[in-house]
Amino acid sequence: VRHGVALVAALLTGLLAATPAPAAPRIAIIIDDLGYSRPAGEAVIALPAPVTCAVIPETPHGRRLGRQAAEAGKEVMIHLPMATLDARALDPGALHEGMSEAQIGAVLDRAQTLLPEARGLNNHMGSALTAEAAPMTRLMDQLRRRHLFFVDSRTNAATLAERSAHRAGLPAGRRDVFLDNRRDLAHINEQFNQLLRLARRRGHAIAIGHPYPETLDYLRQVLPLMEQAGVEVVPVSRLLAPPAASVGAAPRPPGAALTSNP
């Protein structure tokens, strides 16, 4: 605990010493993989900031947590399982290679029935599917009809998902930083600092984390410090580029690297 307090104190000192940005930098934090554990999901919902809750639909507690998150004023996303390069087993309700647009639509119908509060979608795993043009085009066409936004988790550096979303006319964005691909406090602190550096440099940045005890303990300590540090925490939908802004845009530099989240 002392080590954690020292890290947070050092973080705050660094933030306050930084040159103020012309406008408050904005960060969004998506917490993925909600639905397996009710206590972990409720701990995410209780975090002292508008984090975005990404819920896997076909999980034991997904439906309840989606409702609770919306009631608490948290933004809800569908965290949809998608095919991976290593062909690992997927949760029910996943998107697989070779699905027709009608089949993809049926998966989304079920997901929206379970999570009617969801305003958008991001990929759970998906290192194979997000790199294929045809299924991404089919998916984004379906999301457009449903007025859902899309965030690319970037589990494959060759992903086509964000570009496909913009071509389909969706508000879309991408993950810049994974907070907790290593579950230790020092690494999470390092990644959070990277998030803040990106936000200060370009005005905004998006992070993805998970409902791990280490991540939640860290966020409970650091999120209340953001206002004093001049950083605004917002739902991810507020950071998404409109379609015309990013078609053909160059990739963002930092934060786009592949990590161990297939």
Describe the function of each predicted region.
Residues 15-24:
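Bacterial Sec-dependent signal peptides at the C-terminal "C-region" and cleavage site
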Residues 31-33, 53-57, 78-82, 123-125, ...:
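A cross-domain feature marking catalytic cores of carbohydrate-active enzymes
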Residues 23-89:
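Active-site beta->alpha N-cap acidic-glycine motif
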Residues 231-262:
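C-terminal accessory extensions appended to soluble enzyme cores
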Residues 1-4:
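Positively charged n-region of N-terminal signal peptides that target proteins for export
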Residues 100-193, 200, 204, 210-227, ...:
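Catalytic domains of cell-wall/extracellular-matrix polysaccharide-remodeling enzymes
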Residues 69-117:
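Substrate-binding cleft of extracellular glycoside hydrolase catalytic domains
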Residues 6-16:
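Bacterial N-terminal signal peptides
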